[in-house]
Amino acid sequence: MKNRKKPIGIIITISIVLLLTIVTLLGWAYYNSKLDLIQYDDGSKEIDTSTSYAIDNDELDIADLPDAPEDVDASGGIEILEGDIYHDDNVVNILLLGTDERTDEFNENARADAIMVMSLNTKEHTIKLISIERGIGVPVPGRNDDWITHTFRYGGAALTMQTVRDCFKLDVERYVRVNFNVVSKAIDKIGGVDIELTQAEAEHLNSAKKNYYESGSDIQTVHAGTNHLNGDTAMAYARIRKIDSDWKRIERQRTVIQAAINQVENSDIFTLNALADAILPMVQTNLTKAEITRLMLEVPAFLSEGSKMEQMTIPTSGTCWNSVGVDGRKMIGVDFEANAQILKTFFYDIS
């Protein structure tokens, strides 16, 4: 009797192992199919040096900044900051670029309408996010000084990464680019986001049809207070700057990101699958599949910590001033040394 049970036990064990293997392989195949949706690109682009390449009518809405310090020539050339770049094996810094094509296709002539750096500490499982003001004046190879947002249009993600490394001495070798048009669709996939609106913001959104940026978009009628926004309205909110400044615009972008994260945390597996199918084809990165997988394996640890993102904007108050760049365009002059030190302290908790 024992001899009869033994083969049955072996068969059951083998069957379970085979079943687990099949499930694992299917799971890996599914996961890999999602990774295949992403556009992998090293971010390089031949630098364009034509003088009319930037968007001529682009404006910079910034709060009143002081004049340049007496020892700074506000109209002079911007010099690259000297010094070493600090590195920590436990910290991964990723440049996040939001490009504003207003179509479902990437355009190499797009500009980076949002520039952020997300810092992931895989030892402490903390997430930190900085927003970089788009109007910061930076040196551009083969050109005069210009806004940091235009570096993407001149030389792609590679040039923007290089500029961030050079100007802020920040260790960033990886980037993720997202088409803003697909962000709107992604927000719709997760059922919208809750955003608190001021009276001025509500009035602006209710008149958004006058704004060519929102032409043809499904902008809701909103009110002051908490609103549940669809994708188009959330993106219109994230773009607002006319009623106050570029600084507040950055805050709004981060507000939308946090609201979307909050919504995703409460989404079921079917919603997450639809979200991945909608957004991943319009994601471009130089992260490898192996690097993405390593970071994905850390996600449970990040979530278990229950930590919110620590956030800040660069440049900080008291470290910037009015400056002038290409063709007399107003720019933000920056004390790069001071901001580099601030970032080092923020990301690595060292002085």
Enumerate the predicted regions with their spans.
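C-terminal solvent-exposed extensions
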Residues: D42, I47-D84, N90-V92, D100, ...
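Extracytoplasmic
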Residues: D89-V92, A110-I115, E124-I132, R143, ...
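Structured segments of extracytoplasmic/periplasmic soluble domains
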Residues: L97, T103, G135, Q162-E173, ...
